[in-house]
């Protein structure tokens, strides 16, 4: 057998093994044999580059390292589906469609909890993959998606086709990846979806390949050009070699639809991957235009959302955390329980009133869920299992410094009033260094906690004295010369941050980033702001009595005055200047910023627009000139497209601001 024939034979064997193992769950060769075939193919392709082929399974190994992701404009927007939250809403959805198209049938498909992706093929050869992004513009993640073993690099037919699907990470892989990260002292991923999203955004495709992402496809762009129904489309995708979730069904009445959802709710708890609902679509494509669309969603489809998962567990203890403003938050320490894709061992109890209203006690059995599928929360006590648990009593002293706690009239929270409280200081230091405030790279939560424990950081000015401990810092666990140098450079650079960031970073109660700017627009230096009178502050638009009281209280405190003087002497900016560029193309233009941007927060983008003479509004109207849209942009983007307003993605924004 000649070399070229052997290479083709190896590719065929490996592709067949990949398909049967990853798509059909039917392994035909052992891992040992598979690895041997792959090694042989890699060696032959390396030795004989003239036989290189972009569809070779060796392309899934990874190896391309990118500087950044390129933007990709979708030929057809990747928009969302409307949510259906209960059986009553399901009936409304069903009846509305039946009025337009009587006796229509529906497909039901599991909604995979992952990352949406579009896949582009030319003459049956995989060419490009892109994320959803803001629905109009996504990111090119081709090299990373190539590493997914269930992705066909060559289809069974030479078609020009665009296919959409969901990238996800299995429970097994998720546990393995987090174990590796724990052993490397890295932050753990919160859940498989978070892990999949983080992996897809890796610039090094070798890292992606090691994390073993997976894929399900569910539709074709312009599907009616290939088939007449959604069911046929799913079968068609499978025939082409795409992985398709096998648990789809065809139903023809409301009872069958309701039963299917109930069955999916049972099934999903046994699956090796996460799901977060059921996608329901009218089966016949010919009815889509008749049924129509809203401004944001197609009317012929919806996503039934499973009720938030709840679990019963035990309250082992109630502890108290000190926030950066001194707020004392009670937290339930729970017997660990798996909820919605992650292990939950703590849950917020909000405040004393919340605990007393629900009568939560240590040793109680409680029902826990994730609020918004994110934040663990105790929702009720299982009273039938209670024995002799003592009623909850709020602590009277700060858990960090033992100072007396205070509760202001009309407020639910208790506060530690000690300005030098170490617990408050840790959170205050973390906030000060955060991206939204002074943006000190490398000085994250864990580093702050370590330096605080080692007594290098107790106050904000201590941050700017860390250079005097350079040699000692290099000896700390997880540090070293390069990391310390990077940290100290970031600290030095932060001295040039604008005064509004400093004011926000100080953690003054009720003073967020926007309020800080508003205050400085009227008192453009630390001295002027410190001398501002309560009665003058409340005359400023958007500055009410609570903010005015917080500001005057903060600046009248002698310890705070000394700290600010120290920061001034250390070289931080103490005056505020807005340089409005009246000749810039943004001058006089009204913007709306929506979605999540990669390199800016929405506040940062708004700051740039305003400094270039533009105005930032909170809502889209006919008076809006531009909508700056990031990922997961929702109704504001939809309205902009309806009104014909120019939509600007982040890449264009970066170019424009330098004009």
Curated annotation (Swiss-Prot):
<dbReference type="InterPro" id="IPR012340">
    <property type="entry name" value="NA-bd_OB-fold"/>
</dbReference>
<dbReference type="InterPro" id="IPR001357">
    <property type="entry name" value="BRCT_dom"/>
</dbReference>
<feature type="binding site">
    <location>
        <position position="132"/>
    </location>
    <ligand>
        <name>NAD(+)</name>
    </ligand>
</feature>
<keyword id="KW-0479">Metal-binding</keyword>
<dbReference type="GO" id="GO:0046872">
    <property type="term" value="F:metal ion binding"/>
</dbReference>
<dbReference type="InterPro" id="IPR018239">
    <property type="entry name" value="DNA_ligase_AS"/>
</dbReference>
<dbReference type="InterPro" id="IPR036420">
    <property type="entry name" value="BRCT_dom_sf"/>
</dbReference>
<dbReference type="GO" id="GO:0005829">
    <property type="term" value="C:cytosol"/>
</dbReference>
<dbReference type="GO" id="GO:0006281">
    <property type="term" value="P:DNA repair"/>
</dbReference>
<dbReference type="InterPro" id="IPR041663">
    <property type="entry name" value="DisA/LigA_HHH"/>
</dbReference>
<feature type="binding site">
    <location>
        <position position="421"/>
    </location>
    <ligand>
        <name>Zn(2+)</name>
    </ligand>
</feature>
<feature type="binding site">
    <location>
        <begin position="31"/>
        <end position="35"/>
    </location>
    <ligand>
        <name>NAD(+)</name>
    </ligand>
</feature>
<dbReference type="Pfam" id="PF22745">
    <property type="entry name" value="Nlig-Ia"/>
</dbReference>
<dbReference type="InterPro" id="IPR010994">
    <property type="entry name" value="RuvA_2-like"/>
</dbReference>
<feature type="binding site">
    <location>
        <position position="305"/>
    </location>
    <ligand>
        <name>NAD(+)</name>
    </ligand>
</feature>
<keyword id="KW-0520">NAD</keyword>
<dbReference type="Pfam" id="PF03119">
    <property type="entry name" value="DNA_ligase_ZBD"/>
</dbReference>
<feature type="active site" description="N6-AMP-lysine intermediate">
    <location>
        <position position="111"/>
    </location>
</feature>
<keyword id="KW-0235">DNA replication</keyword>
<dbReference type="Pfam" id="PF03120">
    <property type="entry name" value="DNA_ligase_OB"/>
</dbReference>
<keyword id="KW-0227">DNA damage</keyword>
<keyword id="KW-0234">DNA repair</keyword>
<dbReference type="Pfam" id="PF14520">
    <property type="entry name" value="HHH_5"/>
</dbReference>
<feature type="binding site">
    <location>
        <position position="166"/>
    </location>
    <ligand>
        <name>NAD(+)</name>
    </ligand>
</feature>
<dbReference type="InterPro" id="IPR003583">
    <property type="entry name" value="Hlx-hairpin-Hlx_DNA-bd_motif"/>
</dbReference>
<feature type="binding site">
    <location>
        <position position="109"/>
    </location>
    <ligand>
        <name>NAD(+)</name>
    </ligand>
</feature>
<dbReference type="GO" id="GO:0003911">
    <property type="term" value="F:DNA ligase (NAD+) activity"/>
</dbReference>
<dbReference type="Pfam" id="PF12826">
    <property type="entry name" value="HHH_2"/>
</dbReference>
<keyword id="KW-0436">Ligase</keyword>
<dbReference type="Pfam" id="PF01653">
    <property type="entry name" value="DNA_ligase_aden"/>
</dbReference>
<protein>
    <recommendedName>
        <fullName>DNA ligase</fullName>
        <ecNumber>6.5.1.2</ecNumber>
    </recommendedName>
</protein>
<dbReference type="Pfam" id="PF00533">
    <property type="entry name" value="BRCT"/>
</dbReference>
<feature type="domain" description="BRCT">
    <location>
        <begin position="581"/>
        <end position="659"/>
    </location>
</feature>
<dbReference type="InterPro" id="IPR001679">
    <property type="entry name" value="DNA_ligase"/>
</dbReference>
<dbReference type="GO" id="GO:0006260">
    <property type="term" value="P:DNA replication"/>
</dbReference>
<dbReference type="GO" id="GO:0003677">
    <property type="term" value="F:DNA binding"/>
</dbReference>
<feature type="binding site">
    <location>
        <position position="416"/>
    </location>
    <ligand>
        <name>Zn(2+)</name>
    </ligand>
</feature>
<keyword id="KW-0862">Zinc</keyword>
<comment type="function">
    <text>DNA ligase that catalyzes the formation of phosphodiester linkages between 5'-phosphoryl and 3'-hydroxyl groups in double-stranded DNA using NAD as a coenzyme and as the energy source for the reaction. It is essential for DNA replication and repair of damaged DNA.</text>
</comment>
<dbReference type="InterPro" id="IPR004149">
    <property type="entry name" value="Znf_DNAligase_C4"/>
</dbReference>
<feature type="binding site">
    <location>
        <position position="398"/>
    </location>
    <ligand>
        <name>Zn(2+)</name>
    </ligand>
</feature>
<keyword id="KW-0460">Magnesium</keyword>
